[in-house]
Design a protein with these regions (language model features):
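A cross-family structural signal marking well-folded subdomains
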Residues: 1-183
Length: 184
């Protein structure tokens, strides 16, 4: 949770030790009480729900948890900071949570299937975190925009899926096959 909290604050790939960057970018900007009450407690609660596919709500919990299953099957956790921040900030809006997690799963799938490197992934999620910070009151009626795939990304995703899936690395190939199988 500390690593993801650091990422939410810094929005960049880690360059120094976690301790150094946490002190520099997090502890210098919030009080200890704020850190615990406003960040660590809600972020930890969100992390547990995301990692264990245990989102609870009166509506859409099963759908959200199904999407979380696939997010957790990706070969990285770069998607986790925006998911933690979003869930911590919108815990009682299950409609918007479903919309967000569905879009996030599509973005994470795109990044995995098209074999984007860690720098591209971190940069892509950075812009989502920047928008989340600048628009904390976003709603389903006026949702976050940076979570959407661009036209170029959609085209690249489609071309990759239309390509030679069986020559891909096992991680990418198996993810695609299992994900397609889940729709049947």
């Amino acid at each position: 949770v500390f690593t993801h909290t650091r990422t939410i604050f810094v929005k960049e790939r880690q360059k120094k030790t976690l301790r150094e960057e946490f002190e520099e970018y997090v502890l210098k900007t919030v009080s200890p009480e704020q850190l615990i009450d406003d960040y660590l407690v809600p972020y930890t609660n969100a992390y547990v729900q995301l990692k264990n596919c245990e989102f609870t709500a009166t509506h859409h919990a099963d759908e959200v948890n199904g999407l979380l299953f696939w997010l957790n099957k990706t070969n990285n956790s770069d998607w986790m900071p925006p998911a933690i921040k979003f869930l911590a900030e919108h815990p009682n809006d299950s409609e918007y949570v479903l919309w967000f997690i569905r879009k996030l799963e599509r973005l994470a799938s795109y990044l995995l299937v098209t074999a984007q490197d860690v720098n591209h992934r971190v940069d892509r999620y950075k812009w989502l975190l920047v928008e989340m910070e600048s628009r904390p009151d976003s709603t389903l009626a006026d949702p976050l925009r940076n979570i959407e795939l661009t036209d170029w990304e959609k085209e690249q995703f489609q071309q990759t899926l239309d390509g030679e899936i069986y020559t891909m690395t096992a991680q990418r190939r198996n993810y695609i096959i299992q994900r397609l199988d889940s729709f049947m």
